């Protein structure tokens, strides 16, 4: 069949079917169909998925004045487009526009349009590329665009993503159908009031937000499967989590207390990263051990150097009071002596471990941190762990440099890993051949270590 015949067949379809077809295209592709004919020009204005992304529509000039007029023309185009929309329900609406505070009237019109069409999936990104920390956005909060009154009356939402605007969580009247929420660069006071009205919530992702008012997530939200906090600040002292079906939990930021009233016994992944901390906090040991104990069932567990260092302040710095179910353990590390107790603690607490990954990260000095062990003798102790005897098959080192402490840890694992099949060493990115010479030599040394397993293969990538 030639292309002309295909076009003829498509032209025989009803407008209803053609709208369904273009609604499965990207918005940019849907707009391109308007060039086919007058009929298509009208049909493309009925697509059910609308996406206005400034990076796809405009190539901005270097001059700030020229950029302003380009953005003004873009907002006028978007408003004109929705004013000429001839369709019915809108399934999804996306708006990505930086420096939007000068165009609040136009942005408000676009939001009200989406609300009027009973949008199910709403994504508003009004953030600035230059923002790096919460404070960057918080200082500009009075100038951020405020969501219109009509927004708080919407009842059709299934997905809500809001970046860089003023939003009052407690005022959203009927979010009972919402399954996914993602907030970034927003003050989130009284978030608990919103979550208490979302019984179908499955995913909650919060990044770079401040004044988060979240005292608890209760069993009312027992469908919640994924919970992520990244570089946020909380107004509460702690948050209680009753999340019996949680699959993924990730936290990045300063030490914060989560009390788990319940957690899934079949978790997929847990991630704990306190690298924003710069001071050694002895009292954080209890928080860390409580978190680890609550996440015992996680099949994949990732922790940062700060956690490895603070483990020695746990009530029992040898092992958790119950075994972890972890199969893959990812340790972000500098291989410093003050992390050794934490590394051994995690090995000792993971009797079913199959893959151990070390990811080298840049050093971040922790004030008042003093190693409590002799680094020269620590890995020479004749102490093995259950996982080394029965389950550990693979060890990975990402950004392998071949430092003294790296080699000591690897020598220990190879000497006692009875089931070990692979040790994969990945070279650092961006080094030239001269810089790689000593690293290759160190990798060769690893291949010569005395191995307990007869099937071990050491590979340098």
From Swiss-Prot:
Record's keyword annotation contains Disulfide bond: no
Single GO biological process annotation from the record: pollen sperm cell differentiation
InterPro entries: F-box-like_dom_sf (IPR036047), F-box_dom (IPR001810), FBL13/AtMIF1-like (IPR050232)
Keyword Glycosyltransferase attributed: no
Start and end residues of each F-box domain: 7-55
Keyword terms: Nucleus, Ubl conjugation pathway
Localization annotation: Nucleus
Task of the protein: Component of SCF(ASK-cullin-F-box) E3 ubiquitin ligase complexes, which may mediate the ubiquitination and subsequent proteasomal degradation of target proteins.
Protein name: F-box protein At3g62230
């Amino acid at each position: 069949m030639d292309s002309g015949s295909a076009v003829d067949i498509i032209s025989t379809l009803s407008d209803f079917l053609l709208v369904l077809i273009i609604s499965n295209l990207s918005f940019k592709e849907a707009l391109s169909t308007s060039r086919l004919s007058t009929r298509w020009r009208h049909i493309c204005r009925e697509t059910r998925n609308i996406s206005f992304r400034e990076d796809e529509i405009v190539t901005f000039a270097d001059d700030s004045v020229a950029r302003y007029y380009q953005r003004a023309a873009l907002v006028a185009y978007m408003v004109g487009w929705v004013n000429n929309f001839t369709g019915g329900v809108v399934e999804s609406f996306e708006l990505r526009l930086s420096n939007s505070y000068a165009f609040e009237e136009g942005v408000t019109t676009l939001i009200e349009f989406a609300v009027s069409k009973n949008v199910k999936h709403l994504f508003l990104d009004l953030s600035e590329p230059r923002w790096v920390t919460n404070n960057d956005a918080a200082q500009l909060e009075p100038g951020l665009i405020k969501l219109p009154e009509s927004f708080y009356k919407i009842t059709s939402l299934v997905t809500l993503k809001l970046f860089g605007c003023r939003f009052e969580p407690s005022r959203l009247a009927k979010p009972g159908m919402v399954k996914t929420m993602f907030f970034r660069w927003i003050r989130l006071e009284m978030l608990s009031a919103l979550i208490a009205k979302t019984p179908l919530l499955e995913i909650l992702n919060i990044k770079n937000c401040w004044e988060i008012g979240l005292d608890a997530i209760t069993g009312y939200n027992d469908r919640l499967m994924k919970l992520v906090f990244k570089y946020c600040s909380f107004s509460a002292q702690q948050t209680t989590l009753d999340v019996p079906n949680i699959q993924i939990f990730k936290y990045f930021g300063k030490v914060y207390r989560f009390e788990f009233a319940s957690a899934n016994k079949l978790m997929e992944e847990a991630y704990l990263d306190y690298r924003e901390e710069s001071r050694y906090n002895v009292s954080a040991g209890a928080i860390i051990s409580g978190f680890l104990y609550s996440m015992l069932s996680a099949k994949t567990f990732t922790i940062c150097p700060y956690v490895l260092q603070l483990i020695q302040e746990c009530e029992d710095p040898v092992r958790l009071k119950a075994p972890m179910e972890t199969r893959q353990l990812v340790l972000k590390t500098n291989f410093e002596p003050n992390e050794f107790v934490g590394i051994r603690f995690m090995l000792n607490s993971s009797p079913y471990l199959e893959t151990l990954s070390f990811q080298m990260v840049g050093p971040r000095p922790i004030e008042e941190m003093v190693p409590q062990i002799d680094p020269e003798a620590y890995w020479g102790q004749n102490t093995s762990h259950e996982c080394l005897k029965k389950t550990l098959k693979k060890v990975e080192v990402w950004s392998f440099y071949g430092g003294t402490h790296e080699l000591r840890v690897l020598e220990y694992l190879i000497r006692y890993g009875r089931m070990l099949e692979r040790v994969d060493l990945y070279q650092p990115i961006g080094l030239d051949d001269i810089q790689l010479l000593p690293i290759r030599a160190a990798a060769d040394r690893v291949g010569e270590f005395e191995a307990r397993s007869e099937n071990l293969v050491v590979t340098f990538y």
